[in-house]
Amino acid sequence: MFVKEQPTGSISAGVGYSSNGGLFEASINERNFLGQGINLNATGTLASEEIRGDFSYVNPNFKGSDKELAISLFSQVDDYENSGYQNKKLGTKFATKYEIYEDIFFRPNTVIQYDKLETSGSASNLLKSRAGDFTTTSIGYNFSYDQRDSRFNPTSGTLFYYDQNIATFFSDIPTLQTIVGSTSYKKLYKESFIGSAKIKIANVVAFDEKDVKLSDRIFANTSDLRGFEPRGVGPVDNNDHIGGNNLATLSLKSTFPNPVPESLRANTFLFLDVGNVWGVDYSSTILDSSKIRSTTGIALDIVSPIGPLSFTYSIPLSKASTDKEQNFLFNIGSSF
């Protein structure tokens, strides 16, 4: 018998174009380190106003316990020179995960994070009042219920999760962050039309009459609200989006028969995203639009000889005047 070893590593890169410049992201992933099923991942992001690096270690069966052990390190610098401030954060996260009932998983975690917000003379007075050094120690947990028929391109089933993180002891600003989400999949017509509906709701509040620090504020990412930059929607201070205390999004998607040859091994889908980011606790004068944002578009995923390719084109249907659009997004990956 001849057994061919399958590749367990991958390299991926992504490029985005938006009204605020370009975005480049690259990652290296090894799914079977030392032949023990250990997952190692390193990711770097470079944008006009952001530099971020992440490294994670995940052992799915730590010491034969059937429990997952995950350790991650992260560092990020947000540099908004035109608005006169820079925010740095550095931290680590420890987590474990195990199944408590059939299809129900529990994931407790703890995070230690250090933040440093520096301002210059061009910063607004409100941003200057947010400056300082902050240490945060939080504990959190996640419950998830997963009945999807597949984790890769599912055609039926539901994924539900409830995530909460509490920062109290040894934290300069005590906060509570809650995220609830659900995604359901269903065959709409034969195998060509697979529909999905994704809902996400998030909230963050501070205690002891304090305000949520900038790095804990909520932003909509490109999978929540396509067509906009990851930091391009929500409350604005001195022409910069500062994130909100609340987020709500709804994403509807459906595949359809491929207009490209089958030899390209492609999936195409249409989508409609609706949502908003709102709420500012540290000032009532911040520009905070209640307008519901919505976008529609088309996406194409191709499995090519050089790895998976993803193209997304989005058109905003409704937006606020302060929003930053990102109409086109391209990603490329490879395996080794």
Model-derived segments and their meaning:
Residues V58, D146-S150, A167, T183-K187, ...:
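Short beta-turn/strand-loop junction motif enriched in small, turn-promoting residues
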Residues G9-I11, N276-V280:
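Small/polar (Gly/Ser/Thr/Ala-rich) solvent-exposed segments
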Residues F2-Y161, T175, F193-G195, N221-N238, ...:
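Gram-negative/organellar outer-membrane beta-barrel architecture
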Residues E191-F271, V277-G279:
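Extracytoplasmic gating/loop element in the C-terminal half of outer-membrane beta-barrel translocons
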